[in-house]
């Protein structure tokens, strides 16, 4: 085997109760459809022949040094606790230390049944695999912490969902797959030794300066506050912010029914399973606080003096809304050209958003257009913009380089939902042209790319995607 992956597997050295050793299940006729060469270089992976990479990234050939396993976790799903979830379709091959010194997991998603599959087939179909590949790489290019996509492979098999669909496997890369739910499962079971071991492991891996469980809680809080603010700044809606999808490392993980807003409205929901809007765009900061409270509840279980720790944990959690608001304001102030927000700037941003919602303005294009004299064109009634812009321009007289700040904070290109659906439809028919084009264009989201201006346009009435689906 010529492909070389320099594994160093710390999670596999934890006690067996953290995971189950599980080899991927081979597939019939793997075909490599995407390989992220830049990410491979960062990870120190020496690629092999295309045929060989197809075998490895489909799970047919386990590379030397891998210790494949499925991780155990539980979690709150739409507010209801599920005591055992775990990797039902994913296999962690192992970890590598990148050239940047960061340890990362390499995981095969859609690699077959595990002890945690709960009756599922352990497989994924092509659509969600390509969606996660495109969207996660777009998020990375936007500068938002995220899992990454190393490879996508067609399996040559069909999976049965609403109909027979082409199977696929995604190779996902993450700083870890530790979730809030990883802590919850041991706390709920009263396995305090495992909970302490997990806490020490998470601190050593992600936050070496954190002091004990409450230091870890504060570090996760800060990372999540920064992350959610960045989501809000690009109109990203995760769609399924369960605690098992909340990353301890502060990365976006488990894209499922994710979407980007076209027309701005704070209550926007795309996920077909989010029937009551729990994870709507505007609710995401509050849900992040709720998820942090569940992590706090789990971490507290290892304390000897629980009363004192409860008080400290409460203070840490209660500080998160203010941190979120501060991070949100920094993000949105930059979007209107303000490098260091001050008094009155929140009201200025909020008033623009109110008018955008009322006038059904496109979220991405409106903010991008603030750097050019065309933002008023995004409003059905341009005078709604004009009256706000008077106050805004007056505020910008205090800024040195507002145009540069606007361009750096506002992408021209995002993975618009209708383009993702068009890409999937074409790929199922064997045409990867749009998939490849999206990956190329979205790698430079802040650059003007005149040849691809069509990818900045909102959907027509017939192209609107009203709902998104997990679909894996």
UniProtKB/Swiss-Prot annotation:
GO terms for molecular function: AMPylase activity; ATP binding; magnesium ion binding. It catalyses: L-seryl-[protein] + ATP = 3-O-(5'-adenylyl)-L-seryl-[protein] + diphosphate; L-threonyl-[protein] + ATP = 3-O-(5'-adenylyl)-L-threonyl-[protein] + diphosphate; L-tyrosyl-[protein] + ATP = O-(5'-adenylyl)-L-tyrosyl-[protein] + diphosphate; L-histidyl-[protein] + UTP = N(tele)-(5'-uridylyl)-L-histidyl-[protein] + diphosphate. Its EC number is 2.7.7.-, 2.7.7.108. InterPro entries: SelO. Mg(2+) binds at residues 245, 254. Keywords: ATP-binding, Magnesium, Manganese, Metal-binding, Nucleotide-binding, Nucleotidyltransferase, Transferase. The keyword Nucleotidyltransferase applies. The active site is at 244 (proton acceptor). ATP binds at residues 86, 88-89, 109, 121-122, 172, 179, 254. It comes from the Bacteria. Nucleotidyltransferase involved in the post-translational modification of proteins. It can catalyze the addition of adenosine monophosphate (AMP) or uridine monophosphate (UMP) to a protein, resulting in modifications known as AMPylation and UMPylation. Belongs to the SELO family. This is Protein nucleotidyltransferase YdiU. The lineage of its organism: Bacteria, Pseudomonadati, Pseudomonadota, Alphaproteobacteria, Rhodobacterales. The gene is ydiU.
